[in-house]
Amino acid sequence: YPANEGCLLPMKVGPCRAAWPSYYYNSKSEKCEEFTYGGCDANANNFQTEEECKKAC
């Protein structure tokens, strides 16, 4: 398991309608994967780059 507990949270797009490419850690595949973030109400499993995601998770 990742050391950062936020990495275990589910991917969360959020209620806003922006379309920002972001990354989250998929605990099932054990990889950082891209998703489209809505721009607000994120959880701790939300990273601007794949590199940030890999460092954290």
Swiss-Prot record:
PROSITE patterns xref list: BPTI_KUNITZ_1, BPTI_KUNITZ_2
Subcellular location: Secreted; Nematocyst
Keyword Secreted attached: yes
SMART domains in the record: KU
A GO cellular-component term linked to this record: nematocyst
Tissue distribution: Expressed by acrorhagi.
Disulfide bonds: 7-57, 16-40, 32-53
Residues in BPTI/Kunitz inhibitor domain copies: 7-57
Main location group: secreted
Domain of life: Eukaryota
Function (record text): Serine protease inhibitor that is strongly active against trypsin (700 IU/mg) and moderately active against plasmin.
Official protein name in the record: PI-actitoxin-Aeq3c
Organism: Actinia equina (Beadlet anemone)
